[in-house]
């Protein structure tokens, strides 16, 4: 996943930027975000207003439930190869969305989740409703299954926070990020002398790459294999990966078993292992390309020992996603070598 478009350079805020929410929407536009899905809520009415009144702002997709909004963002990212945004109303909207956010986390999908909260100033709260809808740390609801979260408390902090969220969600392995903005921050006028920062100064980190020694070792093992099989997982995330896998399979003459978490290999290709029985059972070497769950396809073969044991070459980003809260990391698989 890479950023789309070239954000503008640093500039003083033009007259069109009057409110905090205007600056937030400007960042969405600079990031190349084309669509925003949400179930309307009062805690982000400022952002909603700026989306409606800013020419060229991301298109709005109205939803009846927050889980639908986040699920739309998940599907969009998988189809378009870039994130979209979903707006979530306060504590209750975030709670509604939590299951869909966990789905996106498990699916390694990039998305910008933007929530409203407060007012944090108790003097500005309406009786009852604003109190039960405000949390001390709202992100704690989903902190265990997002890559990063933040709640900037002034406009001087919003730009860097947004840039960090964008680079974090787009870096591999991908995942959702959550930003939370106080109602007052959105609806207050921009401070005098406000300079709108360029998020283009903060590029997405390059994806991890294996060491040359690991590549040479993998090549030696694959060339020596009698019945190599490629097991494909998240390697199909980008078009260039799709084409590279076809070239690798053809160079090795190795069938490819696509696990289906992404469309990694053309099912009509002669080396497609779709529906072909016995491939993994008879393989002497399996090259697993970013497969998180190996126990299902390989089963008891993971426990083989001796000269005829399966040689598993595990190339994966999964360890970089590891968190302590859920066991979505799957069983630890023994391998000849694990390469990131």
Region annotations inferred by a language model:
Residues 2-340:
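N-terminal alpha/beta PP-like core and its mobile active-site loop of ThDP/TPP-dependent enzymes
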